[in-house]
UniProtKB/Swiss-Prot annotation:
PANTHER family noted in UniProt: NAD(P)H-QUINONE OXIDOREDUCTASE CHAIN 4, CHLOROPLASTIC (PTHR43507:SF21), NADH-UBIQUINONE OXIDOREDUCTASE CHAIN 4 (PTHR43507)
Native source organism of the sequence: Acaryochloris marina (strain MBIC 11017)
Catalysed conversion reaction: a plastoquinone + NADH + (n+1) H(+)(in) = a plastoquinol + NAD(+) + n H(+)(out); a plastoquinone + NADPH + (n+1) H(+)(in) = a plastoquinol + NADP(+) + n H(+)(out)
InterPro entries: NADH4_N, NADH_Q_OxRdtase_chain4, NADH_Q_OxRdtase_chainM/4, NADH_UbQ_OxRdtase, ND/Mrp_TM
Descriptive protein name: NAD(P)H-quinone oxidoreductase chain 4
């Protein structure tokens, strides 16, 4: 078969899903689930290797449009088709999905309860998350977006902590109800005009009136604000993280939150640019609220998982600011922040899980003095925390700096608007090391809990755990030292996207129109002569 016509994306989506069929038939003579774990890990790695191969052989960095495109009629009477493709916006997140999921499978080695069902859900979620980033049909996007909720709900409700049913129910209520807004907006856009279609490129080409755009934008924003999440629609996340296991933490922080940021750019910005110009100042304000409020709330948390969860909410505020900056640098920083936080968030939550497995507590006051028992975990926790507080030389620093500079240099907003926003966001950056460093002090060098530190099970990191963190730190440091590793994947796309949406900004459009008019006046004035060059 010609490699140019091979259905790469469909293969990457359906391979892990189809592989789940074999899970009930894998023999497990010892009843510990070891063969099942190895099978799931092999399937995850095979899919990731195929993804890397497809990326290096099929993806063109200089191309801003869709690549590896596939179109198959599904319900032609309704204008629905299985249409997938990857561009600079989706490809980094597809790569992130393969990387994080493979490591999450390795991180799930201690899971012994119902391993067949557990890995069935993980592999099904793997394919579904790639589909969310690849599908180019709005109705199919809604379907895979909804189907993603089922594995997460079951992973929370079956393998979660003491309040797992409450956390899982809250998650499904928030996300399922908000997702109805996607369906309503999708149907409205599909039926608008003479042609019934759910194809994203066809929808982007339609000429919607501004009021219609604003209504659809609001519907999409509500749904994606829950998943991102945006304050005040964030309260499901601390509860979900508070009850999840380590591998589910990694999937939530590493991939699930990025679905909200990706969808906000793909649907709100690309399909509804005029409405985005009106909503952009509000998005920036919401981003600042996310940064400040979540940072202050994280500082007050005494539960380790909830503290890191609020830290995630704070960092996602930079994504909102970058998306609304109307600059190449700001938009690029938003995409980089999603990738960076996916890596950093996954590493921190994995270490939280490793610490809990040893201490059996998440309350900071009940920890203390464990650095002497767990020096390797302390070193890894400290390094990942430095990445989270945007230490120079790590990916978080580059992403946040790009967002800051992108907004500060944006000509879409007045100086009176930009300066307070940059100052307030900067305060949020200052708060981050305060709560993260105090967290490290309380866990590892706080008042020693003799009963805890003398326990024989309080052992240091094992090779598997060191390997997982090492795999996450390599791209975190690599991107921090040489950001082009990742930015070259999406630079062409973000540049094209910003050029597409900038004319929708009234202030920019007025200036450009005035410039064009002045040039036209000069050209039309027959008496005008260029000054002679002496």
């Amino acid at each position: 078969m010609n490699p140019d016509t091979f259905p790469w994306l469909s293969t990457l989506i359906f391979f892990p899903i189809m592989a789940t069929v074999a899970l009930p038939f894998i023999p497990d003579p010892k009843g510990k689930g070891d063969p099942i774990r190895w099978y799931a890990l092999v399937i995850g790695l095979i899919d990731f290797v195929l993804l890397i191969y497809a990326f290096y052989t099929q993806y063109d960095f200089a191309e801003s449009g869709l690549q590896m495109v596939e179109h198959y009629d599904w319900l032609p009477q309704l204008g629905v088709q299985w249409s997938v493709g990857a561009d600079g916006l989706s490809m980094p997140l597809i790569l992130l999905t393969g990387f994080i999921t493979s490591l999450a499978i390795l991180a799930s080695w201690p899971v012994t309860y119902k391993p067949r069902l557990f890995y069935f859900l993980i592999l099904a979620m793997y394919g579904g998350q790639i589909a969310v980033f690849a599908v180019q049909d709005l109705l199919v996007f809604f379907l895979v977006w909804e189907l993603e909720l089922v594995p997460v709900y079951l992973l929370l409700s079956i393998w979660g902590g003491y309040k797992r049913l409450y956390a899982a129910t809250k998650f499904i209520l928030y996300t399922a109800i908000s997702s109805l807004f996607i369906l309503v907006a999708a149907l409205a856009m599909a039926f608008f005009g003479p042609d019934l279609t759910f194809d994203l490129q066809s929808l982007a080409a339609k000429d919607y009136p501004l009021t219609f755009q604003l209504l659809c934008y609001t519907g999409f924003l509500v749904a994606f604000a829950v998943k991102l999440p945006i304050v005040p629609l964030h309260t499901w996340l601390p509860d979900a993280h508070g009850e999840a296991t380590a591998p589910v933490h990694m999937l939530l922080a590493g991939i699930l939150l990025k679905m909200g940021g990706y969808a906000l750019i793909r649907m709100n910005v690309e399909l509804l640019p005029d409405a985005h110009a009106y909503f952009a100042p509000a998005l920036i304000i919401l981003g600042v609220v996310n940064i400040i409020y979540a940072a202050l709330t994280s500082f007050a948390q005494r539960n380790l998982k909830r503290k890191i969860a609020y830290s995630s909410i704070s960092h996602m505020g930079f994504v909102l600011i970058g998306i609304a900056s109307f600059t190449d640098l700001g938009m690029s920083g938003a995409v980089l922040q999603m990738v960076s936080h996916g890596l950093i968030g996954a590493s921190l939550f994995f270490l939280v899980g490793a610490t809990y497995d040893r201490t059996h507590t998440l309350i900071l006051e009940e920890m203390g003095g464990v650095a002497q028992n767990m020096p390797k975990i302390f070193a890894m926790f400290t390094t990942c925390s430095m990445a989270s507080l945007a230490l120079p030389g790590m990916s978080g620093f580059v992403a946040e700096l790009m967002v800051f500079v992108g907004l500060a240099t944006s000509d879409a907003y007045s100086l009176a608007f930009r300066v307070p926003v940059v100052i307030l966001a900067g305060i949020g950056v200052i708060l981050t090391p305060i709560y993260l460093l105090s967290m490290l002090r309380e866990i590892f060098y706080g008042p020693e809990n003799k009963e805890l530190t003398s326990h024989e099970k309080l052992v240091d990191a094992e090779p598997r755990e060191i390997f997982v963190i090492a795999c996450l730190l390599v791209p975190i440091i690599g991107i921090g030292l040489y950001p082009k590793i990742i930015t070259q994947i999406y630079d062409a796309k973000t540049t094209q996207l910003v050029a597409y949406i900038r004319p929708s900004v009234p202030s920019i459009a007025m200036r450009e129109a005035a410039t064009v008019a002045s040039v036209s006046d000069i050209e039309m004035d027959s008496s005008y002569q260029a000054p002679a060059i002496k």
